[in-house]
Structure formats: C-alpha cells, structure tokens
C-alpha cells in the first residue's frame, strides 16, 4: 500500500502559489483570521495557517475576540473586518461559542472573501459547479490529494462517508463535477460496509475514530481519511483503521500527516484567487 502523505502535495501547491503571487497587481494578498476564545485546536490551526501564509509570501492578520464577547459586539467587529477593503479573504475559526449567531455570520460574510466556503452563496456555487465560488478548504484538499497521486476520478465509483456541509456534501459535489459516480453514506445507511466495499475510491469524513474496518474496503481501493479523532489511548487518529487496511488498499492517507496538511495550502490558494479577482 502506498502511503499518500500531505506534505508533498502542500509543497507542490505552495510552489505554484509563489509564482502566481508574482503576477498580482498592487498589494500582496491579505488574509484575516478570526478567532473567538482560546480553544486549543483553533489556536493550533491558526498557528499553522499563519506559518503557511508567511511561507508563500502573503499578508496575514489575526483578530482575536474574547470567548464571552456579546453576540452584538462580535457581529459589529466581524462587519468591520468584512468591510475592510484591504482584506482579500477571511478565515473564521469554528465552531463559535453557542451564544454567537453563527448563521448570521455565514449570511453576512462577503462571498468574495469567504475562503472556506461557509456562505450560502459559495455553497450554492459549489453545488452548481461554478468555479468562481470557494469550496470548503478541507473538501478541496481531498481533490488535491487525488490529483497529486495521479488517481483518475472520471467514471470511478466513489463512496463518501459523512454528509456534513463542511466536508461530506461539498466533496461529493466536487467529485461529481469531475465525473465520478458518487454515493454518500451516513448513520442511517443500511449495510454501510457493503456500500463502501463497492467503492474504488473511499472518502471517510464521519468523525468516528477507526470506524472504517477491512470489511469496508475493496481490494485496491484508494482511501482518503479526512477524520481527526482521538483514540482510546489518547492518540490522534482518523476515521480509518489504518493498520488494518494496509494489505487491502492500494493508496491511503495517514492521520496525522494527510489531508489536514494540505488544507492551509488550499486556503492560501483561495486567497491568491481572491486577490486576482479584486
């Protein structure tokens, strides 16, 4: 089994972006990262994103709000960032605290700056196959991984495990745009294992540690693991029981070190795209 790591994929994207940035008129692209509170995973992702933006040579400003900020104050602060003409793109770290109206933010973010595809406008564009929109970065990272590995998507049977708006549904749409035959399975699916085993490409995005066992995977299948979980031993793991499928899959992505490594490079790619569309 070939282990498809994310770092070479990310580096390939980064190299292309560094060249693309040279062709941008005016100021360098400018990303705003918005974080509410001090959730460790948010802080970790923020650090990685800041590092990635520095690596490709774009501007990045972080905006941090207290976890107990009122909804009204946060919405006002968000609007100031959203309406700043110097900012090309916005990354909002989610989930927000429960007292913050996340739907209001999704509806008011400028679709041209919505780099992680949270607005209804961009989700609709992804579903319509309109390339002027932005897909969620993690969903697009799945496609980048497959392309880098030289996996032919056209005509392939693909099963996506999970139907979230963040990964499952948009990645299914991106795969269909590439002419894959896509099946989406979820917690209500009858005989999920049999449906998954029919797939030539299996994308696991359920958020359930090591749920994808050997009986889910066809011989020679390509397995892309989007899950990020903690196992019983407190170790980071994906949705796939990686060691158990080693002698079955032809290609598989690890966790950590797989799709997650590519997500911030896709974010940078979206930022450069936004700057070109000024």
Language-model region placement:
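Positively charged, low-complexity intrinsically disordered leader regions
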Residues: 1-27
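Short beta-strand segments enriched in small/hydrophobic residues
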Residues: 28-38
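Anion-binding alpha/beta catalytic cores of soluble intermediary-metabolism enzymes, centered on
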Residues: 91-153
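Rossmann-fold NAD(P)-binding glycine/threonine-rich loop
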Residues: 103-123, 227-278
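Short beta-strand elements in bilobed, periplasmic/extracellular small-molecule ligand-binding domains
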Residues: 53-67, 182-184
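Glycine-rich phosphate/diphosphate-binding loop of Rossmann-like nucleotide-binding domains
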Residues: 36-50, 133-222, 231, 235-246
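Short, well-ordered coil/turn residues at beta-beta hairpins
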Residues: 93, 205-206, 226
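Short, well-structured alpha-helical segments in soluble
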Residues: 73-85
């Amino acid at each position: 089994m070939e282990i498809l790591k994310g770092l070479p994929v990310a580096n390939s994207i980064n190299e292309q972006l560094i060249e693309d940035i040279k062709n941008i008129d005016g100021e360098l692209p400018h990303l705003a990262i918005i974080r509410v509170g001090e959730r460790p995973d948010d802080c970790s992702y923020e650090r990685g994103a800041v590092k990635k933006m520095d690596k490709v040579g774009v501007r990045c400003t972080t905006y941090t709000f207290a976890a107990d900020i009122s909804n009204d104050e946060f919405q006002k602060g968000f609007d100031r960032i959203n309406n700043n003409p110097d900012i090309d793109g916005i990354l909002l770290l989610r989930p927000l605290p429960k007292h913050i109206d996340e739907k209001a933010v999704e509806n008011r973010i400028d679709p041209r700056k919505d780099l992680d595809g949270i607005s209804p406008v961009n989700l609709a564009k992804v579903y319509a196959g309109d390339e002027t929109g932005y897909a969620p970065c993690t969903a697009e990272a799945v496609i980048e991984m497959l392309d880098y590995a030289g996996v032919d998507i056209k005509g392939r049977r693909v099963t996506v495990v999970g139907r979230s708006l963040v990964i499952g549904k948009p990645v299914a749409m991106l795969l269909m745009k590439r002419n894959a035959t896509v099946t989406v399975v979820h917690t209500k699916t009858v005989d999920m294992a049999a449906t998954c085993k029919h797939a030539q490409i299996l994308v696991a995005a359920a958020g359930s540690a090591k749920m994808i066992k050997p009986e889910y995977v066809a011989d020679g299948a390509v397995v892309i693991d989007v899950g990020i979980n903690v196992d019983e031993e407190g170790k980071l793991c994906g949705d796939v029981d990686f060691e158990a499928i080693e002698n079955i899959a032809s290609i598989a992505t690890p966790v950590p070190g797989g799709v997650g490594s590519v997500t911030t490079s896709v974010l940078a790619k979206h930022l450069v795209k936004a700057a070109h569309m000024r």
